[in-house]
């Protein structure tokens, strides 16, 4: 029987074969744990993280969805400071629902295009 984590890893590998981030259009990847949420802008060609934001770093309070939205705002601010306006969104095998969707919507409102 395939567990949820094995299913996610399979989807993640399939999607990562198709998308890649560059300096001009980095990959916005999201990692979700039970308590925290993390977002990174990655240049896959150089293998560098250009910007990052997380609920752990910001020490926020509120519901998990509210925190995800704040992390989305923070990654959008970090991207604009780095001169990035368009990204490739990598949901990392998670469903585009709940906290992932809140983070993506907040990043879009913050000025990122994907």
Swiss-Prot record:
Q: Tell me which Gene Ontology terms the entry assigns under biological process.
A: translation
Q: Which UniProt keywords apply?
A: Ribonucleoprotein, Ribosomal protein, RNA-binding, rRNA-binding
Keyword field contains Ribosomal protein: yes
Q: Which domain of life is it from?
A: Bacteria
Instruction: Kindly state one GO CC term assigned in the UniProt record.
Output: cytosolic large ribosomal subunit
Gene Ontology molecular function: 5S rRNA binding; structural constituent of ribosome
What InterPro entries does the database record attribute to this sequence?
Ribosomal_uL18_bac-type, Ribosomal_uL18_bac/euk
Pfam families membership:
Ribosomal_L18p
Give the family from UniProt.
Belongs to the universal ribosomal protein uL18 family.
Quaternary data: Part of the 50S ribosomal subunit; part of the 5S rRNA/L5/L18/L25 subcomplex. Contacts the 5S and 23S rRNAs.
Q: Which PANTHER family match?
A: 39S RIBOSOMAL PROTEIN L18, MITOCHONDRIAL, LARGE RIBOSOMAL SUBUNIT PROTEIN UL18M
**Described function:** This is one of the proteins that bind and probably mediate the attachment of the 5S RNA into the large ribosomal subunit, where it forms part of the central protuberance.
Q: Mind telling me what this protein is named?
A: Large ribosomal subunit protein uL18
Which organism is this protein's natural source?
Answer: Porphyromonas gingivalis (strain ATCC 33277 / DSM 20709 / CIP 103683 / JCM 12257 / NCTC 11834 / 2561)
The lineage, from the top, is: Bacteria, Pseudomonadati, Bacteroidota, Bacteroidia, Bacteroidales
């Amino acid at each position: 029987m395939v567990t949820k984590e094995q299913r996610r890893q399979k989807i993640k590998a399939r999607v990562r074969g198709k998308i890649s981030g560059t300096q001009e259009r980095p990959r916005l990847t999201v990692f979700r744990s039970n308590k925290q949420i993390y977002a990174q802008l990655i240049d896959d060609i150089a293998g560098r993280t250009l910007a990052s934001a997380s609920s752990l770093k910001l020490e926020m309070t509120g519901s998990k969805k509210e925190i995800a939205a704040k992390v989305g705002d923070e990654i959008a601010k970090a991207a604009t400071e780095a001169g990035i306006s368009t990204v490739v969104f990598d949901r990392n095998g998670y469903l585009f629902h709940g906290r992932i969707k809140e983070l993506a919507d907040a990043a879009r409102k913050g000025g990122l295009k994907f």
